[in-house]
């Protein structure tokens, strides 16, 4: 009788282990494919709970009061709300001393008599700048104001949507400052924080899940009209991934914005699909009458226009 060879049983055991490993690897691969297919290929129905559906599309004034008043000024916002508009869309940036001010361009040159970047100026320096004369030489006193001033002024009069301008991924503190002010004024029901940058919106939700957020997007990089009004050194290109709908589909699942703010030139099939899925969609910025009519006919949550009075008239017809 021969002595058993340990190697005789080891080979089947190795075969069984190898088979289990292959099956486990295949299962992991299948799971990964399914996850990726869901993230990038599936568009589920909107399930947010913080947005109340209006009976008709809302009309917001772009940059305060569109073409009717100085860009991003409280002066403009007061006149837009007095005109009966549902809300206003403005832009927020941090100053050198970490105050959140409302201002569109990264530099102050185009809109004021001063020069330099917003990030390099103190809050006091920014608030001393008058937005009036560059809009109309006869207009004085339309000074830059803080986000807090806007929140205080808009309360009870309409909705304030503020784009937080953060070009990169590094934390700047802008989200914390915005959330602190919303909490201080119990402004959750009339302030929306928006951004092209999904990381910013993710941080906002981590700070306070009840703050309403809006993801802004477009299909192209900046068009010549937008480029023409920005200093060459201030142009921040929109990253390629944020211009691809399949990637934005995944971003929406991870970041979970409450609303979408979609450029009116985005692929119409994308726009129609998101509205059909129940997303509260703002369409920006249809300004020509035909573009306004097309946007309003889609029955979006709202439109943001540089011609808000005409948009309001068309909506109410």
Q: Residue spans of the language-model regions?
A:
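Phosphate-group recognition and catalysis centered on beta-loop-alpha active-site segments
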Residues: 2-317
């Amino acid at each position: 009788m021969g002595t058993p060879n340990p190697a005789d049983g080891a080979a089947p055991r190795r075969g069984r282990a190898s088979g289990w490993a292959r099956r486990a690897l295949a299962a992991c691969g299948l799971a990964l494919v399914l996850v990726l297919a869901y993230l990038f290929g599936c568009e589920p129905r909107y399930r947010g709970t913080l947005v109340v559906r209006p009976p008709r599309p809302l009309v917001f004034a772009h940059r305060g009061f569109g073409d009717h008043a100085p860009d991003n000024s409280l002066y403009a916002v007061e006149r837009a709300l007095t005109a009966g508009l549902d809300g206003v869309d403005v832009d927020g940036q941090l100053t050198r001393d970490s105050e959140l001010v409302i201002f569109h361009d990264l530099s102050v040159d185009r809109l004021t008599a001063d020069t330099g970047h917003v990030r390099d100026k103190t809050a006091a320096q920014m608030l001393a700048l008058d937005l009036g004369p560059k809009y109309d030489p006869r207009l004085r006193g339309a000074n830059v104001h803080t986000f807090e001033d806007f929140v205080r002024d808009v309360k009870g009069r309409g909705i304030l949507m503020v784009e937080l301008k953060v070009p990169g991924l590094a934390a700047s503190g802008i989200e914390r400052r915005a959330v602190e002010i919303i909490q201080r004024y119990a402004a959750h029901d009339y302030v929306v924080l928006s951004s092209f940058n999904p990381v910013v919106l993710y941080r906002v939700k981590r700070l306070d899940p009840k703050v309403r957020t809006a993801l802004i997007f477009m299909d192209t990089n900046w068009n010549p009209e937008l480029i023409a009004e920005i200093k060459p050194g201030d142009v921040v290109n929109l990253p390629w991934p944020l211009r691809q709908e399949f990637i934005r589909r995944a971003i929406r699942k991870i970041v979970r914005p409450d609303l979408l703010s979609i450029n009116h030139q985005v692929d119409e099939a994308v726009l129609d699909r998101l509205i059909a899925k129940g997303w509260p969609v703002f369409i920006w910025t249809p300004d020509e009458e035909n573009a306004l009519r097309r946007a309003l006919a889609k029955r979006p949550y709202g439109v943001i226009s540089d011609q808000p009075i005409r948009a309001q008239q068309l909506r109410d017809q």
